[in-house]
Amino acid sequence: MNLLEKTRKINAMLQKAAGRPVNFKEMAETLCEVIEANVFVVSRRGKLLGFAIKQSIENERMKRMLEERQFPEEYTKNLFNITETSPNIDINSEYTAFPVENRDLFKTGLTTIVPINGGGERLGTLILSRLDREFDNDDLILAEYGATVVGMEILREKAEEIEEEARSKAVVQMAISSLSYSELEAIEHIFEELDGTEGLLVASKIADRVGITRSVIVNALRKLESAGVIESRSLGMKGTYIKVLNDKFLSELEKLKSS
């Protein structure tokens, strides 16, 4: 395959995704095929987002690293010293992707490191390694193209997380604002009693202790449940089982209590 055909191979993988999130494993496998090298897509914290192996490396530490999908902390930190594509790093470098304890077996091992950037920050690193020949300019063009695609995908995921967090927070705030003063007071006492994200409570006991009617507690729980903030289930004489579904609820409730 020439450079154009290889680029088209990557494009075909992207077009196949058609608006869906790009799978990091698929991206690694496509780059592995067109560049003919081992490919590792590593997050800024060293998590292995995706990888594909062209030449198997028989080493227990490497095997464990792939199983745990985590690069060593020290190695990951050192990668941040590389701010632009660094091709053909040999086995004696601290940046080699080959096991240094087996240097003699991997004398010809070469590593190429491509920073993954986006939104003005370092998002991760694309690491390529192979034994048989140097990485040439065509390989580097494909690697940098791949790193750009991965960077865009990481940014998209981060934007989705922020959006989801904002949505969860808004749902909680709306649910809390729908409560009357006495219902809010009841909810505060319920979750003090619960002391966590799920548990069992007896509504009548809380009603007697706080000095409110049981119906206030029932209404308050019903409002939160209809908003999807909690799940509640009556267990008859044992009481009511409650589970928090929205992880923003308890922190927002705490803010109200301290304000």
Swiss-Prot record:
Residues 1-155 are annotated as: GAF domain. It is found in: Cytoplasm. SUPFAM superfamilies: Winged helix' DNA-binding domain (SSF46785). The keyword Amino-acid biosynthesis does not apply. The keyword Oxidoreductase does not apply. GO terms for biological process: negative regulation of DNA-templated transcription. Keywords: Cytoplasm, DNA-binding, Phosphoprotein, Repressor, Transcription, Transcription regulation. Signal peptide: none annotated. The modification Phosphoserine is found at S215. GO terms for molecular function: DNA binding; DNA-binding transcription factor activity; GTP binding. Residues 203-222 bind DNA. GO terms for cellular component: cytoplasm. InterPro entries: CodY, GAF-like_dom_sf, GTP_trans_reg_CodY_C, Transc_reg_CodY_N, WH-like_DNA-bd_sf, WH_DNA-bd_sf. DNA-binding global transcriptional regulator which is involved in the adaptive response to starvation and acts by directly or indirectly controlling the expression of numerous genes in response to nutrient availability. During rapid exponential growth, CodY is highly active and represses genes whose products allow adaptation to nutrient depletion. HAMAP family: HTH_type_CodY. Belongs to the CodY family. NCBIfam families: codY_Gpos, PRK04158.1. This is Global transcriptional regulator CodY. It comes from Geobacillus kaustophilus (strain HTA426). The lineage of its organism: Bacteria, Bacillati, Bacillota, Bacilli, Bacillales.
